[in-house]
Amino acid sequence: MRWFLIIALSTSAWAQTAPFAPPEDISFRRANIISEGTRMSAEVFAPKASADKRLSTILMAHGWGGTAALLRPDAIAFARAGYLAVTFDYRGWGDSDSRVILTAPEPREHPNGRFTAEVQEVREVVDPMDEVTDWFNAIAWLQAEPQFDPARLGLWGSSFSGGLVVYVAEHDSRVKAIHSQVGAMDGRAMIANETERRKTYEEATKMARGELGYPAPGVKVIGNLRGAPVRSKFVPYDPVEDVNKAPQCAMQFVIAEKEELFDNRDHALKAYQRFTGAKNLVVIPNITHYGIYLEAHRQAQKLAIEWFDKYLKP
């Protein structure tokens, strides 16, 4: 099986905190989402003309090595189309806080449940099970947003997050539609052969015995992808196998005809063929994986809006 992992859109640290001025017709604010006790950075976009209305909502997050700041053009387009659009950075990515681990055993006594400790950050590593947890917590956060319409929630995902949104829809019936573009949907490449299997399970054993820590932040071990995988966390991650756990969700899959990072037949094509609910498949001709962000970007954006309009608009 060919390695399936995805695009790491390059961005520097300063770009994530650079001032952002939204268009005049768009309401914009930054927000914080708490995921398993850690603060995640979010951005909220809405049409100013609909300030007093509940809106169909599109929740968005980045793929492997990206940040929420890169999603602003799409979020603005969705807001202009009448949606509440919310983007967020996973824990340990972009402007979100890092997860932390103790570097020494917890003290035996700590009044009021508090103690001072030295910790180490877990940052810019890729763990699909952690990331779907962040999606679930972002959905929980949305429930109290004044403009959020709880009956009309859609998810947008691209590349690695194109698989994450499928997984989330399979496990949360509040998701009514997804748009998944150039999505990778099966983590079992980590155990695809005996060499990969041994590497994955040896890493897990060493981590469990304290002989190996998390990868360093942002390290590149797979091509130019920023962020090393926590290999064992990919083994149970196979949303392509369970698409029919989301009968309530309309699923659109957009793929690149000349996809070079993985075999579409093992990912979106397989998911589309298996899914028995409302679905659509679009093959964009003559583009590679990265073309979805370049020459086919506007086409993909238009396809997403049309799909969400069909299944989320009143």
Regions found by a protein language model. Give the residues of each.
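N-terminal cap/lid segment of alpha/beta-hydrolase-fold proteins
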Residues: 17-53
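Conserved alpha/beta-hydrolase
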Residues: 78-99, 104-115
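The serine-hydrolase catalytic nucleophile loop
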Residues: 64-76, 90, 266
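Serine-hydrolase catalytic core
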Residues: 219-287, 299-303
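Catalytic active-site module of serine/aspartate enzymes centered on a nucleophile-bearing elbow/loop
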Residues: 285-290, 294-314
